[in-house]
A protein has these predicted regions:
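Gly/Ala-rich beta-loop-alpha elbow adjacent to hydrolase catalytic centers
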Residues: 74-83
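Short beta-strand/loop motif that positions the catalytic acidic residue
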Residues: 160-161, 167-169, 173
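Short, surface-exposed "cap/lid" segments of acyl-processing enzymes
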Residues: 2-43
Length: 224
């Protein structure tokens, strides 16, 4: 009898990033050498300018496949939060690897943008940002912060995830505070938090991320 195929492996990039992000590419290259295809999704849905969290979640769920398929989700920053909400809603997700996840995202965006910036965002309908994927100035509509505020009101910004989860978060991260990852992991036995001396991009910690993820996902990996 043919054994069932292993789970899909999906990578979810962060806000204003894209599927060609450094972490996504490096992880995909590493797992390709292990015989695993890590599919890097495009979460700029329906576009960066009109970015919608619900559209991001929908894109991931569509990529999971059929009813009997299973998936491992890697998520960076806002992609990490997206992965959490997909796992909360969809039993096909069997494990998460989260890199500096943007928990309490509405609160964190308010802190990053500041009250004057937030007021301008609401009044003009747009927030000026940097598109890291295309390396150019861009903007995102005010519907996004309204959507994230509503999301946080429903769940206090803390998704209810029951699957095994690995978090790698930098102690020097000034974009998504590590305190929220610590708080979220504290009361969840299935969550392992690894703290590293790094900032939000975690570029200096790629080797550590790969090592921790390999160990965490050992049940899903063939021996090298």
């Amino acid at each position: 009898m043919t054994p069932p195929p292993g789970p899909k492996w999906l990578y979810l990039h962060g806000f204003a990033s894209g599927p060609e992000s450094t972490k996504g590419v490096k992880l995909a290259e590493h797992y390709a050498r292990r015989g695993v295809h890590l599919e890097r999704l495009d979460l700029r849905q329906p576009s960066l300018e009109r970015l919608s969290f619900e559209a991001m979640v929908r894109t991931v769920r569509e990529a999971l496949g059929g009813e009997r398929d299973r998936a491992i989700l890697f998520g960076s920053s806002m992609g990490g939060l997206t992965a959490c909400h997909v796992a909360q809603e969809d039993a096909r997700v069997c494990a998460l690897v989260l890199l500096a996840p943007a928990l309490r995202i509405a609160h964190q965006m308010r802190r990053t943008v500041g009250e004057p910036g937030l007021r301008q965002w609401r009044e003009t309908g747009w927030l000026d940002i940097q598109d890291y994927a295309e390396k150019r100035p861009a903007r995102v509509h005010a519907g996004l912060i309204a959507e994230l505020d509503a999301l946080e009101a429903r769940s206090a910004g803390v998704p209810d995830v029951r699957v095994p989860t690995l978090i790698v978060h930098g102690r020097q991260d000034t974009t998504t505070e590590i305190a929220y990852s610590r708080e979220w992991a504290r009361d969840r036995r299935q969550v392992r938090l690894v703290e590293v001396e790094d900032g939000h991009e975690l570029t200096a910690s790629l080797g550590r991320i790969i090592g921790e993820a390999d160990d965490f996902l050992k049940p899903f990996l063939a021996s090298p």
